[in-house]
A protein has these predicted regions:
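Active-site metal-binding loops of divalent metal-dependent hydrolases
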Residues: 1, 27-28, 54, 184
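Acidic-and-aromatic substrate-binding clefts and catalytic sites of carbohydrate-active enzymes
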Residues: 1-5, 28-33, 92-97
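Radical SAM enzyme [4Fe-4S]-AdoMet core and its adjacent flexible, acidic
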Residues: 8-13, 17-20, 36-207, 211-214, ...
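Juxtamembrane/interface motifs at transmembrane-helix termini
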Residues: 26, 200, 242-245
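Polar low-complexity intrinsically disordered regions enriched in Ser/Thr and small residues
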Residues: 30, 150, 191, 243-244
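Cysteine-cluster motifs in flexible loop/terminal segments that predominantly coordinate metals
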Residues: 163, 227-246
Length: 246
């Protein structure tokens, strides 16, 4: 989100209405003055989560084109303020040996929290880390993809009330495209459902959120989440499987 041309203005408006802002970013490509300006807008209730998957020699392998030095410059500025900071580290084969060193560096830089993420984002087998760092959802994802998954329950993450109206975790990406959640907006799923950006149908430039949610095929999409059998594969993977309805 930090690459939006009016990001500072948007943050300022949100703070004027007493909103709490949580920013997740790779932290790359912005000048020091840009970060200082942002930090002067944010307060101690806001947070910035830096997505850094490795160290200088490995982070760019997943975070394509990320510039290490500019990320370090950003962190050194942000940590001078009372903003909550997190280093989020997704584990891959190429960086699992750097976990302890990265955590140590995060403390040295003054980052408040180091968060280790097990992942299922494998487009190549050689990216898979050791078993202890593989997200348990990975095996379920494979079975859904192959059609060998067993019938299960489903917990609708997009609804605070089961089988109610979609009102939770709804997602709009940096291009203004709407998705039921951030997972359906992932590259591996976004082109396989009715919300595909190629259709140019559910973008907030041309529609209000209310108009999108009231569209016939959108209501049908959410209706299908009531049953594991009829739900979209993405919903089966992230809201079904070994999850419960508790």
């Amino acid at each position: 989100p930090i690459y939006h041309s009016k990001f500072h203005e948007l943050c300022r408006r949100l703070k004027q209405i007493n909103s709490k802002i949580d920013i997740v970013t790779n932290g790359s490509g912005k000048k020091k003055d840009w970060w200082k300006k942002l930090c002067e807008i944010l307060t101690s209730e806001d947070s910035i989560e830096f997505s850094i998957d490795g160290l200088k020699d490995t982070n760019h392998l997943y975070r394509i084109n990320a510039k290490w030095d500019s990320i370090m410059d950003a962190i050194k500025i942000v940590t001078k303020y009372k903003i909550n900071t997190t280093w989020k580290f997704i584990v891959f084969k190429q960086n699992e040996h750097q976990i302890k060193e990265a955590e140590s560096l995060s403390k040295e830089l003054g980052i408040k929290k180091f968060k280790l993420i097990k992942s299922d984002r494998w487009w190549k087998k050689d990216l898979m880390p050791s078993d202890e760092y593989v997200d348990p959802i990975y095996e379920h994802q494979i079975s859904v993809t192959k059609g060998t998954d067993k019938k299960s329950t489903i917990k609708q993450g997009c609804m605070t009330v089961r089988n109610g109206a979609p009102d939770n975790l709804l997602y709009i990406d940096s291009d203004g495209d709407f998705y039921p959640c951030c997972k359906t907006g992932l590259y591996g799923f976004r082109y396989k459902n009715i919300f595909s950006p190629k259709r140019k149908k559910y973008n907030i430039v041309n529609n209000t959120i209310e108009q999108i949610l009231n569209a016939s095929e959108v209501t049908k999409f959410f209706d299908k989440t009531k049953s594991y059998d009829t739900a979209d594969n993405c919903c089966k993977i992230y809201c079904g499987g070994n999850k419960t309805n508790d």
